[in-house]
Regions:
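Interfacial "coupling" helices/loops that link adjacent transmembrane helices in transporter permeases
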Residues: 382-426, 789-831, 835, 848, ...
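Short juxtamembrane loops and helix-capping segments at transmembrane helix boundaries
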Residues: 117-133, 141-144, 276-295, 352-361, ...
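Membrane-proximal extracellular/periplasmic loop immediately following the first transmembrane helix
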Residues: 125-180, 304-310, 540-542, 546-606
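Mid-to-C-terminal secondary-structure elements
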Residues: 5-6, 180, 193-217, 226-369, ...
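Alpha-helical transmembrane segments of integral membrane proteins
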Residues: 66-97, 354-360, 389-416, 420, ...
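Negatively charged linear elements and acidic catalytic determinants
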Residues: 1-101, 312, 346-347, 357, ...
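Short, strongly hydrophobic transmembrane alpha-helices
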Residues: 94-120, 124, 382-383, 426-430, ...
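Small-residue-rich transmembrane alpha-helices
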Residues: 387, 423-496, 537, 826-887
Length: 898
């Protein structure tokens, strides 16, 4: 027996482990046969086996040589397949170009969307082992909440300290809060964000400084003395030119010099994924220098949930176990501090989710999945088109396949060659798709909302994006190449096409694969169009939503007088002067000061009506508050429903008053007038009398259910950060620069920020539905075009294959209408089946989009009916063109070849 012959057979094995087993079996068989021959020659069995082993030689070396021979042959065959595949693609340049462009479009869209999803959802923070980091939130069972934003809240600093010291599930726990600060080191004051953190912040995240050092243990324990700061890489690059000498230099924040001790690593901007790139971090011990108003006292008050906390789990500790352990501590704290912690417990969530926003993560995930699904449909339709093209091409390669089979090529060998060709097409499309994605991500990101700067999110085509593109390219190559390759490699391929080029019509019986592809293409196109239609309708409805105030001819700007250490008296004088100066500018109809931006949320406090409080077990309601000056309601044109609004007589020394919205009135006093009623806030026993009721306005986000809102006089409820809201008689853009100038003249060190028209604010608020509508319309349109091209291509091929049949029918007297019905009917029957399937699938998946839609049902009949008619019309057009071409068939010429 020849061992080389056996090794040669092994070279055809498909699996490595199978090859190894067969190789061992063959070697053992050879030795056994040699042993038997030696025994027959007179040797003893043991001697015979030893002699056989000596004759064979080194078994391990033979195994290694055999494996090397197999690998060499496999590599040689693979190289030959690649070479032949490239030659075939170059030979059919037109087909290859169409295929690569179609795939590149699909890959480019998929990679573009995945780049954004990867940056925001999959890898939101550049920290070590993010899976081990979890955020701690307070859940208050005794406080009624009216919005999902309030279901989970932060921790009080004293509670944080208890959790940190008493837990046994974390290696360490961090607390932080952020606040706007004024940087005074440039040409003009600028607002930055400062993280007030515990000293272990960077250590728990597992970060190393790009330059300098981070906080030392204990560097957060000296109130007003730990004047050190860590700056972000972007701030270092933009403000210090990446100079190493920045370490040790002062950074003036809120008029106080902080010594720069370190630079955070590139790409890190804190534990909020959509935060600005320019950030600063200072020790929590500097809170009294950076916070204003009652926030100064809130840091050490167990009642106020001012801190965000996260910890790193100990190895092997699951999140559920950690949460159960912390709930035990929470119960103990509730017993020890019943007034402050009654009804409060703790909940954990992954920091990866919390970085996007605990309440927004689900929305972002759903939106990301929807976009990936939409572009995935486009790619799948492109795959179906290519599969049909390859099926058509397979008929032209019938002779080639027959010759290859006759020369000894097995079906597996032919399959591998054809799949190599389809994979080469796919990889070529992926390469071009990466170029599309490189430009596409920048184009897509240029439509981001104004509050996100271009460099706030790193949309790099990193290793994750490249691996994703490579993965879908390989899967796609197999997907659109499998059916054509299987059909082309069939031993009976020659029987499917009769001599002379006759073919079959399109239909389940004659061409089941191609018919199925048409149905799938049509169904996927309809699903994509339904999604686009729902979002377009949603966007139209969102734009019609009344915010509750007149949004035209209105602009705002913000400033933080607390950053310049204004006391309340001078700050109130500044506010009055700013509003008066703004109102005196030509073209300005009115101006007011308010704590909150329109559609910007606000500080929330728990409200208790008179006669009810936490001691009586009453469940208070978390309510958004807004401190405003008397001219606020007139400037914003908020309708007064009852009572009055504030006036100059509402001062600190007079009775405490409030104006509430209709939602708050209905919530607390549903069957009676709220005028004259009184309430107090959690932790504050002083009663406030309701003197007026105004219409509801959008508080947190467009499309929300009306939220309870309490307006307080700025003179009675001072805040050190405020917005100037200005009503104009004409275009607000014409007055912005003048108003900004007159306010800046009051204090040249004041940073004036967030200068926007209300139109811009509303536009930002509707950014997500607007982008969703635009992108899904684009993707749906592409899906429609690709599906139409697919139907057209299949029917065109069918007409070519049926020329003899059509010629015979025409010769026997068939009219033009008969031929049109014959050809167009083939495609329309399949398109209608696809529509039915698509409607069923769309009805199921549309229900997942309910939370993303404004004022439109997921099963909106107008959308489904409209999309169905559009797709039917396009399908009919795609069928009609080949059908018209069938009328040009000359019966005499067609029959001449029969």
């Amino acid at each position: 027996m020849s061992i080389n012959r056996n090794i040669s057979k092994l070279g055809g094995a498909l699996r490595k482990d199978k090859i190894a087993r067969e190789l061992d079996d063959e070697i053992q068989t050879h030795i056994d046969m040699e042993t038997d021959e030696n025994v027959e020659g007179g040797m003893k069995p043991d001697e015979a086996r030893q002699a056989a082993h000596r004759a064979f030689g080194n078994v391990a070396l033979a195994q290694e040589d055999s494996r090397g021979a197999w690998i060499y042959r496999w590599a040689n065959d693979f190289a030959a397949d690649l070479k032949f595949g490239v030659r075939m693609l170059l030979k059919n340049r037109g087909f290859s170009a169409v295929a690569v462009i179609s795939l590149a479009l699909g890959f480019g869209l998929n990679t573009t969307i995945f780049t954004v999803v990867n940056a925001i959802l999959l890898h939101p923070l550049p920290v070590r082992d993010i899976s081990g980091l979890v955020q701690l939130d307070t859940v208050d069972s005794k406080t009624h909440v009216t919005a999902a934003n309030f279901e989970k809240m932060g921790l009080s600093y004293p509670n944080y300290e208890d959790y940190r010291l008493q837990n046994e599930v974390f290696t360490d726990v961090v607390a932080w809060m952020n606040t706007p600060v004024t940087w005074s080191g440039g040409a003009e004051p600028k607002q930055l964000q400062a993280y007030l953190t515990t000293a272990n912040y960077f250590d728990v995240l597992g970060l190393r400084p790009a330059l300098g050092r981070f906080f030392l243990p204990g560097e957060d324990t000296h109130p007003n003395s730990d004047t050190v700061v860590v700056i972000s890489y972007a701030l270092w690059a933009n403000k210090f030119g990446m100079a190493p000498s920045a370490i040790g230099k002062p950074l003036i924040l809120d008029a106080i010099p902080y010594t720069i001790i370190g630079v955070a690593p590139r790409g890190f901007k804190g534990t909020v994924s959509l935060a600005a790139a320019e950030q600063t971090w200072v020790p929590i011990s500097m809170y009294s220098q950076m916070l204003g108003g009652f926030s100064i006292d809130a840091v050490h008050d167990r009642r106020f949930l001012a801190m965000t906390a996260f910890g790193r789990l100990k190895p092997g500790v699951p999140m559920a176990q950690a949460e159960a352990s912390l709930k035990t501590i929470a119960s103990r704290l509730e017993t020890e501090y019943p007034k402050e912690n009654s009804g409060r417990s703790v909940a954990l969530s992954s920091l990866a989710e919390a970085a996007v926003g605990i309440n927004q993560h689900e929305q972002f995930t759903l939106a990301g999945a929807m976009m990936m699904g939409a572009v995935g449909l486009v790619l799948l339709i492109a795959c179906a088109n290519l599969a049909n093209l390859l099926l058509a091409q397979a008929a032209t390669r019938d002779k080639e396949m027959t010759v290859r089979a006759a020369l000894g090529a097995g079906r597996g060998r032919i399959l591998r060659q054809l799949l190599t060709e389809s994979t080469l097409l796919s990889l070529s499309g992926a390469a071009v798709g990466l170029l599309i994605a490189y430009w596409g991500r920048n184009i897509l990101w240029s439509y981001r909302p104004a509050f996100i700067e271009a460099n706030d999110v790193d949309l790099a085509l990193d290793s994750h994006v490249l691996l994703f593109t490579l993965g879908i390219a390989l899967v796609t190559g197999a997907l659109f190449g499998a059916a054509p390759a299987w059909k082309a490699s069939s031993p009976d391929l020659a029987d499917t096409l009769k001599a002379g080029g006759r073919g079959n019509s399109v239909g389940w019986r004659n061409n089941p694969i191609r018919s199925l592809l048409i149905v799938v293409e049509t169904a996927m196109a309809l699903v994509a169009l339904v999604g686009a239609g729902l979002f377009v309708r949603s966007q139209i409805n969102a734009q019609k939503i009344n915010p509750g105030f007149e949004s035209e001819k209105l602009f705002v700007m913000a400033f933080n007088v607390g950053a310049l250490h204004y006391q309340e008296g001078p700050a109130q004088q500044f506010y009055r002067a700013a509003a008066e100066r703004a109102a005196s500018v030509p073209g300005v109809a009115g101006a007011a000061i308010a704590a909150n931006f329109p559609v910007g949320g606000g500080f929330s406090r728990t409200v208790f009506p008179e006669g009810q409080d936490e001691a009586s077990g009453f469940r208070g309601t978390l309510t958004v508050t807004n401190s405003v000056t008397p001219t606020f309601f007139d400037a914003l044109r908020i309708p007064i429903q009852a009572g009055r609004v504030f006036n100059d007589n509402d001062r600190k020394e007079t009775r405490m008053v409030a104006v509430i919205n209709e939602a708050m009135a209905r919530h607390f006093w549903p069957n009676e007038s709220a005028l004259g009623k009184r309430f107090h806030f959690f932790g504050d026993t002083e009663m406030r009398e309701i003197v007026g009721i105004v219409s509801n306005v959008v508080v947190i986000q467009v499309g929300e259910d009306p939220q309870p809102m309490a307006y307080l006089p700025m003179a009675q409820e001072y805040v050190p950060f405020a917005t100037l809201q200005v009503r104009t008689t004409g275009d607000p853009q014409a007055s912005i620069s003048t108003v900004r100038s007159v306010v800046q003249q009051l204090d040249s060190n004041l940073a004036i920020t967030n200068v926007q028209t209300i139109h811009e604010i509303m536009s930002d608020a509707l950014w997500a539905p607007r982008m969703g509508a635009a992108l899904l319309t684009l993707f749906g349109g592409l899906a429609l075009i690709l599906a139409a091209v697919g139907v057209y291509g299949v029917l065109s091929y069918s007409v070519n294959q049926q020329r003899h049949e059509i010629g015979i029918r025409r010769a026997l007297g068939a009219q033009e209408g008969d031929v049109l019905r014959l050809v167009a009917g083939q495609g329309m029957r399949l398109a209608i089946v696809g529509l039915v399937v698509g409607l069923a699938v769309a009805a199921v998946f549309a229900r997942l989009l309910v939370s993303l839609l404004f004022g439109v049902s997921a099963i909106d009949p107008w959308t489904f009916i409209g999309v169905t008619f559009v797709l039917l019309a396009v399908a009919l057009l795609a069928c009609y063109i080949p059908a018209r071409r069938a009328l040009t068939v000359d019966p005499l010429i067609a029959l001449r070849y029969d």
